[in-house]
Amino acid sequence: MKKIIYLAVLLLIQTTFNNAVMAQENNPVLVPLPSVDDFTEGEDGWALGLGIGIEYESAYEGSDEFGFEAQPAGAVQWRSGDNIYYFAGEAIGWRGLLNDNWLVGALIGFEEGREESDSDDGRLDGLGNQEEGFELVLQARRSFTPDWRYWLVSRVVASDEGNLALFGVGRRFGEQTDGTGSEVNLVFVVHDSDYANKGFGINAIQSLSSGLEETKLSGGLRSFGIDYNYRENLNSDWQIYGEALFEYFSSEVRDSPIARSNFEAEVGIGVIYKF
């Protein structure tokens, strides 16, 4: 039932914004940002990019253990004017331009759970496994310049296990306007108590089973972060990309026994073939 509700919300949002979209010149990409996949080359209709990436990342939120993981890359996309509908891995969504300065979008994504076995050192023993689920993500960027050199970014994540919001500023580097080059975003993240305790809380039963102190977090500041994205066309078909993320947790999160590290980090690189 929740999947149906999320899909209905997604379609309603798209329909509402679609009426407000302004006609624009035919550009190779919707916006010239390396973090935004666009394989349509400015043409309406279907587009496909498939590839693979390798990530070196924290084993779980707050972990001091790291490991490599292979991830699929790319997406199936369908473009209609200033709107792109897409299916990418574990997410289905839409993004569109309201005008020259506003990029908005919505998606339904798959949220991975957490298992005790995620920690090779047994740091999660006794905490139990968390089920996988779905989340609704609403996103918006507001550019300060016509060429998307500087912008504000916001994102809201809603699920039945809590809510999270991100706000920040970004900058694009390089003179390209085809979606290649690099960009950086500086952000801060807030969460409600449900979302905070999902990742870092310990209830009475978990405390008895794990030996860790019972912990209950309140809502508020979660972290400060910086992320970097890079994209380059090797030729007309092949594309490489890279990304890096660093997130420094707030004092309340750092005080949780689950947070074995004060930060979360991730580095990834991959290759995509555009059909």
Task: Locate predicted features.
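Predominantly the C-terminal beta-signal and adjacent terminal strand-loop region
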Residues: E61, N229-F275
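Transmembrane beta-strand segments of Gram-negative outer membrane beta-barrel proteins
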Residues: T40-Y56, D100-F110
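Outer-membrane pore/translocation modules
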Residues: E25-N27, I84-N185, V190-S218, E252-V253, ...
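Strand-connecting loop/turn motifs
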Residues: E43-A47, G81, N99-N101, S143-R149, ...
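Outer-membrane beta-barrel "beta-signal"
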Residues: Q71-V76, V169, F188, N262-F275
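Transmembrane beta-barrel domains of outer membrane proteins
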Residues: G53-E55, A75-Q77, R95, V137-S143, ...
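Membrane-spanning beta-strands of outer-membrane beta-barrel proteins
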Residues: G45, G67-E69, G133, G162-L164, ...
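Cleavable N-terminal export/targeting peptides
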Residues: M1-D44, S63
